[in-house]
Amino acid sequence: MKNKIIWILSIFCVVLLGLWLWSQRPGLRVEAVLPSQPLVYVRLDHVEEHINQVIHSEFGKNVAAINFPDVLNRNNFSLKDTKDFQHWQRDLGRIWQNPLIRRLLNKEAAVAIYRQGDSYQVFVVVRLTLSTRIAELLSQLSHQWSGGAISRRQKYHGRVVNHISFSRPGLGLGYVRIRDLLILAPESLGHLDEIVDVYQHRSVPLSADSSYNFVRQNGYPFSDGLLFVNFNLISDFWRGEMDSRLTSLGYQTAAFPVYGLSYMPGVVSKFKLIVGLDQKYMTSGIRKTFACPALANDTLKLVPVNAILYSWGGCYDFAQAWSTAKQRLAERPELAESIETFKHRLERHFHMNMRTDVLPILGHEIGGYLTDIDMEGSYPFPRLLVFMKIQDRAKAESLLDKFTEHPVTTLYREQYNHVDIHYITLPLGAHTDPGYGFLGDYLLVASSRQLLKQSIDAYNDSFHSIVSDDAVEQFSLDKGGKFHYVTLLKTAELSRRAQDFLGWIDKYLSGRISMAAVSKQDGDNKKQELDEVIADKSAELVLAQKKLHQLKISSLSLLPLEDPETVNGAIQNLSRETDALRDDIAKYKEDKEDISRLMDNYASGAQSDKLTMYNMDNVLSPVLKGLESINAQAVTVRFGDKVLETEFLVK
């Protein structure tokens, strides 16, 4: 008996060990069962977790609180559109709350779309857990449609392909399980036989697709999500439409054949946009741009720590841009002539030549930053500074001296920490004194000389520079990496400034609405006065017409007794009087119509302003409020002969 128990326990342990080993083996890659050459392919791990994070985030809560049906109604969408949206909203919520969907999206999910002539194939792949039972899931699915379902099984090369027909919605669904993957396809949009062929090596898998592998290899090695789009497979019609718009810019869709987006979550969430490049479809100017080498960004030391938006680029070719602009202007002779005349006037006034004096001293780097938007003056005034790399500082200073010799307004000079600041003053409020100065090889132009001083302080002491900000370190923007373009946004602060700006717009629009109400009252009063004048003039016209009629009748009987000239003179005077009255009445009516049109314009403007205020309060404000939960964002761009990479970093 004892040996029997030991034997049973041994078998039980072996079974448990086998199950554990089976559960630990690597799952089958999704790319191993899908065919190659999809038009679109998207994959996401931990789908439920990521969606819940978005839903329960402050941004998600604020967006969810927006009353979208009311927004659509206020913005004059049709009743059908509003009802369709509400129906879609309810269906989406019901689907997401469905336990079946939650279980299917618990791990990994993918969707692939294939183009076949004028039709498309769609496959959905989900990774199943060890405890998932297909029969149970599909019975729940059948119950969910509450219309009954008819199932049938098909054998294909040793694999069972299941087909389910749902009677109520008139839909069909096919599915096949291969190891831990469940592949589903609408009956009308997918042939699961192809999945079996790929798995059994009779067809080329997605994992062997060179375009897909290009995107995957340039993405994050252990990404949670990946999007792949093959533009070469888009219909000729859409490619023709896009090419017709891009050709004037020197592009063709064939120049950017594949797109991808790789996603990796973390304390700093990372998104990398990958664009494949095919330079044989680019103009020489565009190829020259993509041949620009990446640079180590040395301009962060110019930026004060209180900057809320910063951007820099290291591949600007001003000579090429000047040449391109002249070519474009040649297509519009009238505009080209006026701009050329204005340019010549500037060159004569300042005794310089744009092509020979200005362009040669400009470098390839340009950028700037924003610290605030001042709302205290009559209009919002951005606290903005722009910097530019200079090839020859001595020539640049000599050129700017020509501007100071022939100023268009009074130019002041101040020295701050051994740096000369030149500035002018504007009657727009405090600190509206734009100016310029040099720091190293950079020319700085600012909307306020206070910003120039802040840049000088940052340049001399990194403690005052944005380099000391945690976001710069976490985004690795100061590690000596080479980029083509960099942008940093302190999203929370920028969102608060944007809300302040919306508040200013709200006050401005409220003032316009009040003015429209006053104008309407004035217009109503003027129209009433004109109605009274028109009534009086009309009464005078009736009397004058009666007198004229009587005079004409009586003149026939009295003509032998009266002087004909006297009678005719009276008739002419009275005729002129009636004509003048008619002209006056017509003019008053035109004035009334002008006032009505003006009032209609005021009313239309007020209605538009009210709608703008509503959209700001009920759409933009919640979105901006939600963005306060995002501390900072950064965008970096790198490119080479074959690939353009844009990385989005979110903290």
Report each predicted region and the residues it spans:
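Generic beta-strand structural signal
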Residues: 115-117, 155, 175-178, 415, ...
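A short, solvent-exposed beta-edge/loop patch
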Residues: 162-198, 424-460
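Leucine-rich, highly hydrophobic segment in Treponema pallidum outer-membrane-associated proteins
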Residues: 10-36, 40, 167-169, 174-179, ...
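Active/binding-pocket-proximal capping segment
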Residues: 389-417, 459-465
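Flexible, glycine/threonine-enriched loop-and-boundary segments that flank and lead into catalytic domains
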Residues: 361-362, 369-372, 415-431
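A short alpha->loop->secondary-structure connector
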Residues: 141-147, 191-210, 460-465
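Structural boundary/hinge residues at secondary-structure and domain interfaces
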Residues: 2-8, 13-163, 211-253, 270-380, ...
